[in-house]
């Protein structure tokens, strides 16, 4: 089987990671003790992707939980599925990273990283044929962003040919925990551009808007936001966990989604949007799902896809539905909105259908878009970064951990390059291909 090793780092990563395991354990019929109580063979057919079968028919998540302070992991351990994880796979320090990327990446995190890599090796060795790694973390803090990116580069060194996939929670101005988020995020993106194959950008601002506008929650909590994240993560990984009519693994997804290696930042979406507690039992039609899924209000990143163009799109439909209808609807969307899809990648929308819907829904759809509009998100962080960096505000916290200003300048320009690469392909048309390629080559040099 093609296994995936899951790593969750930092407070945010551990919270959305724990939620993800709750949701998929439920979908696979696995209770908090790791025993199977399901009702369908499909639940077990590809269970090995995310779970290891231990003695006594117990299923143990291939999950590694990492943090620089014990707090969050204690709450995961005492949470609803806390006992399902392998106790040796909790790796934590005592010092904390204090929302400082340099502490996570160079000092505190660097001290802990070897013990994490030991666990990564142990998990990878128990795999039959490891396909890759997935990391859940945030980019605004210290541990998830600093140590998370350190782990990625170390794992990359050791497993260069395995896929590296991240679910990265991007900071947003409306939902800010820390004033140095733009620094931490820029330094992280600088790493992610080079070292990951697929990054799902999940944005707190977009999640708040969804909770507020669509779900009519007046005071959304992190629990509500994480509910949306886990629904999206469950949808995105459906093809990896269940047999479907169009099966996917991480590599196939990457091949379909990433036209240029640096442009691998995806905008996830989900339909139908339901709040916790009020899961709707009314079945949506395929046209409604398709329409909702492409709606800007359903995107989990605060970017408007109408401000850019889609390079590639993958859609995952779940539930019993007619493949023919799905294909018709997807073509319909492309024909009606053809100006929003680049014409120089002819069949750039892929659709997968999985028969098992998520809990409480008859059918659902998950959207993964590689859109040039994601540059809005990077621009937003970059502007905030520049505003502070121009005055060298807060820099002493980073230089005190041994960082150099040069690294900030490099990260800043790498992020700006990324924005202009997205812009370049947004403006590109099919006919000017000749001159366009030469430009590209100069850029590389």
Curated annotation (Swiss-Prot):
The MREI motif is common among all beta-tubulin isoforms and may be critical for tubulin autoregulation. A motif (MREI motif) lies at residues 1-4. Its main location: cytoplasm. This is Tubulin beta chain. Some glutamate residues at the C-terminus are polyglycylated, resulting in polyglycine chains on the gamma-carboxyl group. Glycylation is mainly limited to tubulin incorporated into axonemes (cilia and flagella) whereas glutamylation is prevalent in neuronal cells, centrioles, axonemes, and the mitotic spindle. Both modifications can coexist on the same protein on adjacent residues, and lowering polyglycylation levels increases polyglutamylation, and reciprocally. Cilia and flagella glycylation is required for their stability and maintenance. Flagella glycylation controls sperm motility. There is a cross-link at residues 58, 324 (Glycyl lysine isopeptide (Lys-Gly) (interchain with G-Cter in ubiquitin)). Mg(2+) binds at residue 69. Dimer of alpha and beta chains. A typical microtubule is a hollow water-filled tube with an outer diameter of 25 nm and an inner diameter of 15 nM. Alpha-beta heterodimers associate head-to-tail to form protofilaments running lengthwise along the microtubule wall with the beta-tubulin subunit facing the microtubule plus end conferring a structural polarity. Microtubules usually have 13 protofilaments but different protofilament numbers can be found in some organisms and specialized cells. Interacts with NCKAP5L. Residues 429-445 have a biased composition (Acidic residues). GO terms for molecular function: GTP binding; GTPase activity; metal ion binding; structural constituent of cytoskeleton. It is found in: Cytoplasm, Cytoskeleton. The modification N6-succinyllysine is found at residue 58. Residues 424-445 are annotated as: Disordered. The modification Omega-N-methylarginine is found at residue 318. GTP binds at residues 11, 69, 138, 142-144, 204, 226. It comes from Sus scrofa (Pig).
């Amino acid at each position: 089987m093609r296994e995936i090793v899951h790593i969750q780092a930092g407070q945010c990563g551990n919270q959305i990671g724990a939620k993800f395991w709750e949701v998929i354990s439920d979908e696979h019929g696995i209770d908090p003790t790791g025993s199977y109580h399901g009702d369908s063979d499909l639940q077990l057919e590809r269970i090995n992707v995310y779970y290891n079968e231990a003695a006594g028919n117990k299923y143990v998540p291939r999950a590694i939980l990492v943090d620089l302070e014990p707090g969050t992991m204690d709450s995961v351990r005492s949470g609803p599925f806390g006992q399902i994880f392998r106790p040796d796979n909790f790796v934590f320090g005592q010092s904390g990273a204090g929302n400082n990327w340099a502490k996570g990446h160079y000092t505190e995190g660097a001290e802990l990283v070897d013990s994490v890599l030991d666990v990564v090796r142990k998990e990878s060795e128990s795999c039959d044929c490891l396909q890759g790694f997935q990391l859940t973390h945030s980019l605004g803090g210290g541990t998830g962003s600093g140590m998370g990116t350190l782990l990625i580069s170390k794992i990359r060194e050791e497993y260069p040919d395995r896929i590296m996939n991240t679910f990265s929670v991007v900071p947003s101005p409306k939902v800010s925990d820390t004033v140095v988020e733009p620094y931490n995020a820029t330094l992280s993106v600088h790493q992610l551009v080079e070292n990951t194959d697929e990054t799902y950008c999940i944005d707190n601002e977009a999640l708040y808007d969804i909770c507020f506008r669509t779900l009519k929650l007046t005071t959304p909590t992190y629990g509500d936001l994480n509910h949306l994240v886990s629904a999206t993560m469950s949808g995105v990984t459906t093809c990896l966990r269940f047999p479907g009519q169009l099966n996917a693994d991480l590599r196939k997804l990457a091949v379909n989604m990433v036209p240029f290696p640096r442009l691998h930042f995806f905008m996830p979406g989900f339909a139908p949007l339901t709040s916790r507690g009020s899961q709707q039992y009314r079945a949506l039609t395929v046209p409604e799902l398709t329409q909702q899924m492409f709606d800007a209000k359903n995107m989990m990143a605060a970017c408007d896809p109408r401000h850019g163009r889609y390079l590639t799109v993958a859609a995952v439909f779940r539930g019993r539905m007619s493949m023919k209808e799905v294909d018709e609807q997807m073509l319909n969307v492309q024909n009606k909105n053809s100006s929003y899809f680049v014409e120089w990648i002819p069949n750039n929308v892929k659709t997968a259908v999985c028969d098992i819907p998520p809990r409480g829904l008859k059918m659902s759809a998950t959207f993964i878009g590689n859109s040039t509009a994601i540059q809005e998100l990077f621009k937003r962080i970059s502007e905030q970064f520049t505003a502070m960096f121009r005055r060298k505000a807060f820099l002493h916290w980073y230089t005190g951990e041994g960082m150099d200003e040069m690294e900030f300048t490099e990260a800043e320009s790498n992020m700006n390059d990324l924005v202009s690469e997205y812009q370049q392909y947004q403006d590109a048309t099919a006919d000017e291909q000749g001159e366009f390629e030469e430009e590209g080559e100069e850029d590389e040099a």
